[in-house]
């Protein structure tokens, strides 16, 4: 980009710097306009599941309506990619929060019947039930079991859940997902993997060294869900042994997180 600006400017470093500033300013203006248009669309849709700002902060670092809306559109598209528009049975949204993915899935008639959700955030579940009339959601605990019977679901998906569970507890949670899935059922999950551990802006040199040594890291962080779990691909493969076949593993497949498609054995 700098080379292109320099060729266009042709008037030395000062002109190049001016064009760079102009480009950055225009990018900011475009982002602001996109955010404004999105929020206007949200306001016009009376059926939109839009929780208050304090609940939106529970599921992300930013509380804007546009961010909540766009993240839900993105995550729901990935769910439909894996499970289709007409899932063959019940599908669990493990870590549903206040409905970021749910809103978009409810645009499909089959998903309105197939969807079930649970979260440790009792406030978010209460809001969905009382303010939105959605009864297919439950409060779950920070430790197994989930409030469902064995083999209840044909599918499970979760976004940014294992990323906030200490790595030494990942195996027991994979065992729990195995329990609630029917034989042959599939799961879509995201984790902070090797590429995330290499992010110098996210982790200190000492944290990165510890990750390199043991293949996992639990880092204390501020936020609604304190703590960030980072796990190597080898660590995750070990945690899945005897429970799931790995259909797909993508580095940074869900933004900065790795995403996995698993099949229950």
Name the predicted role of every residue range.
Residues 144-156:
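A short acidic, Gly/Pro-enriched loop at the edge of an enzyme's catalytic core
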Residues 171-183:
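A short glycine-rich, Lys/Arg-flanked "PGG" loop and its adjoining helix->strand segment in the class I
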């Amino acid at each position: 980009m700098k080379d292109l600006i320099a060729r266009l400017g042709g008037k030395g470093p000062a002109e190049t710097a001016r064009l760079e500033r102009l480009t950055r300013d225009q990018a900011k203006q475009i982002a602001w306009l996109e955010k404004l248009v999105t929020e206007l669309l949200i306001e016009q849709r009376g059926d939109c599941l839009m929780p208050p700002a304090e609940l939106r902060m529970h599921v992300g670092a930013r509380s804007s309506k546009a961010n909540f809306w766009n993240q839900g559109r993105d995550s729901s598209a990935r769910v439909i990619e894996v499970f289709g528009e007409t899932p063959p049975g019940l599908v669990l949204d493990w870590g549903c929060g206040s409905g970021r993915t749910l809103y978009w899935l409810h645009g499909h008639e089959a998903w309105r019947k197939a969807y079930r959700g649970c979260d440790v955030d009792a406030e978010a579940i209460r809001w969905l039930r009382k303010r939105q009339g959605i009864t297919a959601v439950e409060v779950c605990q920070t430790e197994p079991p989930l409030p469902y019977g064995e083999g209840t679901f044909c599918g499970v998906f979760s976004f940014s859940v294992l990323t906030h569970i200490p790595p030494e507890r990942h195996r027991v949670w994979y065992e729990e997902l195995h329990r609630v899935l029917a034989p042959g059922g599939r799961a879509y999950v995201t984790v902070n993997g090797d590429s995330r551990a290499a992010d110098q802006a996210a982790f200190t040199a000492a944290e990165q060294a510890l990750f390199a040594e043991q293949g996992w890291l639990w880092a204390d962080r501020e936020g609604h869900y304190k703590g960030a779990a980072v796990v190597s691909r080898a660590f995750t493969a070990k945690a899945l042994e005897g429970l799931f076949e790995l259909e797909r593993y993508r580095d940074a497949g869900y933004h900065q997180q790795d995403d996995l498609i698993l099949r229950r054995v």
